[in-house]
């Protein structure tokens, strides 16, 4: 089992910056405003030859019982319980605060190894603050700058005695189909604010891992959690709610939206979560269109279904709306769920697995050729300026999503309506519901184009 370290401390001392530094990529949102991190976030860290699991936490900050702030602290306490050691981070430039002293006592009571990290130690003011931190009684401070990467050598030396050595890694090799099938399916859950995304994931996990609240915008980072459901692994990203651009006012919310968009691009299947009490709005269409443009498989989950009084015909009406407004993902799976009550979870997970399979599908060449001949025989391409367009052949270039190249005589003259006909026919023939289908046009070279005409 991996050695686990939790990063703790008061808000805005640079915990998320240190987390990003150790995992080697910008996974956690970072901003000067305190309280950016709300949920605990895990990542695989590497420092030299040391490998360990790192947990970023919300800043330790008291609050009334049951409040969002208090529940953020509960998340931090859970992270401390899971950890084998702690990084206690202070802001050396700001010097010690009463909150630092209070939470140093909190760290001592955890009865686990604690490394005191004096962050932002660059410059004279930083050095003075680091010296002041001896008063916390947590040992010698390690002076670092998480933003600039300073002090990582000293941190490595301090960690060597704590983190157990890992076995030598096997030689890297190209991933096989079997290994790819064994990997967790990457799933992003997106939607308007307060649609119930975090509630659904908490039900899947069986614990309140992600903070939930009636207040829209509780989730800020894209939090990744790994689950196993009926023997299949999933890596699920909970994301911040996506509002219309005109409603995105705060700088932090803009960062959160950008983080959610990155999660969509990293995912393989995207679940668009909708509130059953607020039927399709323009923003839902925009989000679905974004998912299609990014080439991800789509599943629509209609949440809070337990609150609906009149249910008959609702899904059929929604299906009609989706197929009308989003023909580019015609046939997308639509599942009614209740994240709070756990209703419809099996159907949702099955829809994710099936959509992932469709997204990875390759059409056999012989079947593709038969379909192509029948499609153009049933509906030949139109004539343009009195000249018939010639479609030569089609080939699949890749999956994820299914993508094809169509060789033809005049690529610029083929109408978009005829391309839509081919895509819809292909989607129906090869059962490709809810996944983007790409057809790229390419002109077949004319072997006589380079020859000059004979003079008359």
Curated annotation (Swiss-Prot):
Record domain KH-like: where: 361-445
Homology family: Belongs to the TRAFAC class TrmE-Era-EngA-EngB-Septin-like GTPase superfamily. EngA (Der) GTPase family.
Keywords: GTP-binding, Nucleotide-binding, Repeat, Ribosome biogenesis
Segments forming domain EngA-type G: 3-167, 185-360
Summary of the function given for this chain in its UniProt record: GTPase that plays an essential role in the late steps of ribosome biogenesis.
GO biological process, one term: ribosome biogenesis
NCBIfam families, per database record: GTPase_EngA, small_GTP
Entries under Gene3D superfamilies matching the protein: 3.30.300.20, P-loop containing nucleotide triphosphate hydrolases
HAMAP family found in the cross-reference section: GTPase_Der (MF_00195)
Keyword Repeat: yes
Annotated positions binding GTP 1: 9-16, 56-60, 119-122
PROSITE patterns linked to this entry: G_ENGA (PS51712)
Pfam families per record: KH_dom-like, MMR_HSR1
Summary of subunit composition and partner proteins: Associates with the 50S ribosomal subunit.
GO terms assigned for molecular function: GTP binding
Species of origin: Bradyrhizobium sp. (strain BTAi1 / ATCC BAA-1182)
Cited InterPro entries: G_ENGA, GTP-bd, GTPase_Der, KH_dom-like, KH_dom-like_a/b, P-loop_NTPase, Small_GTP-bd
Name of the protein in its database record: GTPase Der
Positions annotated to bind GTP 2: 191-198, 238-242, 303-306
């Amino acid at each position: 089992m991996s050695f686990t370290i939790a990063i703790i401390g008061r808000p805005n001392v640079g915990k998320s910056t240190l987390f990003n530094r150790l995992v080697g990529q910008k996974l956690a949102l970072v901003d000067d405003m305190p309280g950016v991190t709300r949920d605990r976030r895990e990542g695989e860290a590497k420092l030299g030859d040391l490998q360990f699991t790192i947990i970023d936490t919300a800043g330790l900050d008291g609050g009334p019982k049951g409040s969002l702030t208090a529940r953020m602290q509960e998340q931090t306490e859970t992270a401390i319980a899971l950890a084998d050691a702690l990084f206690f981070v202070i802001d050396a430039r700001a010097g010690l605060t009463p909150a630092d002293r209070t939470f140093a006592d909190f760290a001592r009571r955890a009865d686990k190894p604690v490394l005191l990290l004096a962050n932002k130690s660059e410059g004279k003011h930083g050095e003075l603050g680091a010296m002041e931190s001896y008063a916390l009684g947590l040992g010698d401070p390690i002076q670092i700058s998480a933003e600039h990467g300073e002090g990582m050598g000293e941190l490595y030396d301090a960690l060597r005695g704590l983190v157990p050595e890992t076995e030598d890694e096997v030689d890297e090799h190209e991933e096989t189909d079997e290994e790819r099938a064994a990997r967790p399916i990457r799933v992003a859950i997106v939607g308007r604010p307060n649609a119930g995304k975090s509630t659904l994931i908490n039900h899947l996990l069986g614990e309140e891992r992600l903070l939930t609240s009636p207040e829209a915008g509780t989730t800020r980072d894209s939090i990744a959690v790994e689950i196993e459901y009926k023997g299949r692994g999933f890596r699920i990203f909970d994301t911040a709610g996506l509002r219309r651009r005109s409603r995105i006012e705060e700088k932090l919310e803009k960062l959160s939206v950008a983080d959610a968009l990155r999660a969509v691009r990293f995912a393989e299947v995207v679940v668009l979560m909708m509130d059953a009490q607020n039927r399709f709005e323009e923003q839902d269409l925009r989000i679905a269109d974004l998912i299609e443009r990014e080439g991800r498989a789509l599943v629509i989950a209609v949440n809070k279904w337990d609150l609906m009084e009149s249910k008959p015909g609702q899904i059929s009406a929604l299906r009609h709306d989706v197929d009308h407004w989003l023909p580019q993902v015609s046939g997308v799976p639509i599942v009614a769920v209740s994240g709070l009550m756990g209703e419809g979870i099996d159907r949702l997970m099955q829809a994710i697995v099936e959509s992932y399979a469709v997204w990875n599908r390759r059409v056999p060449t012989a079947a593709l050729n038969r379909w192509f001949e029948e499609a153009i025989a049933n509906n030949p391409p139109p004539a343009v300026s009195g000249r018939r367009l010639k479609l030569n052949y089609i080939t699949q270039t890749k999956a994820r999503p299914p993508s094809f190249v169509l060789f033809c005589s005049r690529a610029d003259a083929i109408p978009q309506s005829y391309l839509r006909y081919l895509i819809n026919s292909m989607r129906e023939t090869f059962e490709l519901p809810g996944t983007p289908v790409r057809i790229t046009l390419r002109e077949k070279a004319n072997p006589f184009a380079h020859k000059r005409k004979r003079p008359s």
